[in-house]
């Protein structure tokens, strides 16, 4: 009861719009008095006009009157001229738009409208109508969007698909609605096939939507239906074979035309939009912005393609060893590249000297021999001093410096060593690359090597080797000074520093001395 009261209140608020609908119906009756059935319809319109209070029952009478007018137009369409049909369609469209705009403002009223339209169609379809007339009536009564094309303009579509007037979409939607009804009629006539029954429900559930999506769904269902007709035997289809063939051909042609028409409309609208843009006052500025965007997109695409290609090359290529960055005072392990960009391999190390070719010492006197013997025994009992630090890179040791023999006992080096002077590695690398200059040994008639005097030995002219010799001699002298200062007999005074080396006894002499003491 409350629902009916609410609907009545809503209808009374829309009284002016509903009065316009009644006046439009009266105008239709005046223009079509010659058609059979309009006299009764005119009486119904007069009764509606007398009732000033709008209620739900009055609204249902209005919907029934509009449905009867549409039935008469479908039934007597052949009797009307083309101009009269166009005028009647305009008035009907105006009536439908007003009724739908009133119903859209109330959900319950819209449901009542749909129920009443469905009920009227079922009653009118039972009357004497041909198949095409029944389809036409179904389109007029059930096509909500065809009667309200403004809904198409409100749909969120892209600009190429946006039709402000919605006239093209209205016609397109009407054609699709007729095709849908034809497909449903075909499936109803062949309801003895179970597969078609299932598809019939799906086709009937296609909702009112944008024409292209509806066309796409109809095409998909239509392909399935054709496959079912082809796969079934002729005995099953023998009853309606001729009608099925005609209907299938008719639907196929309509779908093809609707498809072509839709793409034609879309292409035309695209061209219209391009023309509108070209006529704008800032069209040149828009074109410049468009070109900049296009260039930016092209550059971005080329960069992406280049990155993908380089990534693919890195994945397919073999991994190469990375070059190690050496410090300034370090010697690299690989030889430098020459000006001709040819890599010269390092020279092979010199072969080891045979032990037989060691030169024999010169003959000396007995006194010198005993003194030399004492020095050798002292050197045998004292551990040798640590060798000087060698630079990296497998550099051969420098030749020994003169006979600066230190007789004092060397001590272990402290943890804090003096910093070594930096050595320029350029000349040293050249020497390594060019090979080593070995001393030439001359042999006598007896096959033994001829020794050379110290005076004959030439001083090394290479500044690198001379620098290394100086470093080594400085290291040895510093070690000797430390050992002398740390000895127990040294009192720290300059006069107490012993300059003579202690006499070292041999094992035989020590044993003889011990036996005498016993």
From Swiss-Prot:
Homodimer. Residues 439-461 have a biased composition (Basic and acidic residues). It is found in: Cell surface. InterPro entries: WH2_dom (IPR003124). This is Arp2/3 complex-activating protein rickA. One of its GO terms (cellular component) is cell surface. Recruits and activates the Arp2/3 complex, which in turn leads to actin polymerization, promoting Rickettsia motility during infection. GO terms for molecular function: actin binding. It comes from the Bacteria. Residues 344-354, 382-401 have a biased composition (Pro residues). Residues 424-441 form the WH2 domain. Residues 418-430, 488-498 have a biased composition (Polar residues). Disulfide bonds: none annotated.
